Amino acid sequence: MKILIFKNLTAHNKKLCKILHSDIKYHYTINLFLEDMMAISFYSLGAAQEVTGSKHILEINGRQIMVDCGAFQGKRNESDNKNRNFDVACDKLESVILTHAHYDHCGLLPVLTKKGFKGNIYATPATRALADLIMMDSAHIQARDAEYLRKQAKRKGEKFNWTPLFNEGDVINAANQIVTLSYERNMFIAPDVQLKFFDAGHILGSAFASLSISGQRKDDNINVLFTGDIGRNNKPIIRNPSTEVPAPDYIVLESTYGDRKHEDVDVAMDELAQIVKRAIAQGGKIIIPAFAIERTQELVYYFHMLVDRKIIPQIPIYVDSPMATNATSIFQVHPECYDKKTHDAFLVHHKNPFGFNALKFVTSVEESKSLNQKEGPMVIISADGMCEAGRILHHLANNISDSRNTILLVGYMAENTLGRRLRNRETEVKIMGDWYKVNASIEQINAFSAHADYEEMVTWLNTIDTSRLKKIFMVHGEKKAQEYFYNYLHENGYPNVDIVKYGETYDIV
């Protein structure tokens, strides 16, 4: 007997087939069984026991779907090497699903398409617009870095061999493969796979990706839910994370703050007001490293409220990030993502939450440099949020050693970043190759976080329909956070949890 039915089965199922076929009298019954068999597995090529580099592969009968294709961030040489050498079989990869437009989730899409991926990339309309912006900004930064390093090498008489990961043309090619899908609309992305997005409440356009995989029989359907990054309730501008997702059999769950409890969202504005008042009394500048997407717009929203209500005086507030400026424009044309309060402000009362007299968006390099010659008090909001690139580095270098100034940290800082060193209160830090004493006050507001903490994630789990839930796969978290969250999940009624390891395959069916 020729066992042609082994084609496209996993090694596990091939072994099963051999065992079942050992008794020839069951030949016809077993063939029928194998025709109905699905082979579904899952593995991660990033954000496995770390936070950055999200790349998750769902394999269905030998065909692959990737969820997110993000860049690694942190130690520069190590991250650069990992970003250049991630191993994806583009001939097996049918499609990519993008949960949101943060660089650690979308940053390597141009590398993937350069490697030969020709399929569709699915995203919400707002995510597509923001991802285009993020990827193009990265291409520009890499081009500038390459030119700077080339000049340095020439000056030192050294050989220069560093090249950007991708260029503008690569970004355009990747963007052309993006297919948009609005929230809560079904789309077949394969004959047996339906995709549906639900609002994740993390940033504008962020989504939970619900995949329904059809078996031979109706009751064989399997639902796999990828959370991407889970947001928090009661954040300004965007809606709360959806709890209307179809009952999942498996959840690939983030764990960024698996060991941390945030301050209540409602205290963010009060804490911001107190820090600003102290800095004004000292006559200093308030330097805020902020992600260009969501965090900057949220800060602008809060500053608008504080000035409007006369809680703080009207001091100059500068947003010094071309990408943040462009992102704010994108926010203004995607009201489908707004919560009711923001929706009504824009569309009913015609009031712009992202514009007021004290606010100035800085565009030119000359104007950015001139801020360092101005006296405080003033607020400068600039990217990158982890202090690894962008104009924020120049503002830190010019202001970090002045004791009148305040550095306000309002977001997640990955390991081995300048932002993490500032958060750890190091007394001296290296910025753009030079060492600086940290004399400025370092302040932190945890309430701004766009990630749910461990209690908020379990509250969300308790609110969705988990009647079919068989297992949780934990990703997107550092080891310490994941170990704590693993125990917390067990204590709260979720005993079937795997902490995902890089490259390790987990059988679903």
Regions found by a protein language model. Name each.
Residues 48-50, 60-119, 123-174, 232-241, ...:
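Pre-active-site segment of Zn-dependent metallo-hydrolases
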Residues 39-87, 95, 208-227, 250, ...:
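Conserved beta-strand hairpin/beta-sheet module of binuclear metal-dependent hydrolase folds
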Residues 208, 233-320, 406-411, 429-492:
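Cap/insert and terminal regions of metallo-dependent hydrolase folds
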Residues 69, 93-102, 109, 121-124, ...:
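Active-site neighborhood of phospho(di)ester-bond hydrolases with catalytic His/Asp-centered motifs
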Residues 23-37:
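Short, Lys/Arg-enriched N-terminal segments with co-localized hydrophobic residues
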Residues 275-415:
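Hard-cation-handling environments
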Residues 138-203, 335-374:
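Metallo-beta-lactamase
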